[in-house]
Amino acid sequence: MFERTWTVRFSDTDPHGIAHYPRIVDALHETSDMFMQEIGFPFWELADEHDFGFPLVDVGFEFDAPLYAGDEVRITLTSDPSTRAVRFEYEGYADGTLAFSGYEQRVCAETGGGGAVEIPDEIREQFVDHVAE
């Protein structure tokens, strides 16, 4: 499992002072960026160096409690890889309370529209290793 802290800023909130959902989605996407960088395969290098990437094909979230400016949110990411895709599952907690949960489904695909390919073993191993932690 990968974990990081996101601080909700005033600029992340709506006129009622509650974190606006697109900013939460941004925080989750940033979490997957950070995870991929930590395992040694940043999204931004995959296309240039390996001729494939992990485009987003499905996303879903449920919001359980509001978040406010100043909240420190512990975001967890758990990866669930298959042969040609990976599902990133997220949970966000503020003061120990589940604020949201969700997922991103990403397919391993060749650049230039070549279609889905198998996740390389060295990346899949990193996904599996982070589940086992």
Question: At which residue positions do the language-model features occur?
Answer:
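Hot-dog-fold acyl-thioester-processing enzymes
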Residues: M1-P55, T111-E133
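Hydrophobic beta-strand-centered segment that forms part of the acyl-chain substrate-binding groove
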Residues: F35-R74, T78-A85, S101, V107
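Short loop/turn motifs enriched for small/polar and acidic residues
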Residues: S11, V57, E91-Y93
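HotDog/MaoC-like acyl-thioester-processing domains
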Residues: F63, Y68-A69, D80-E133
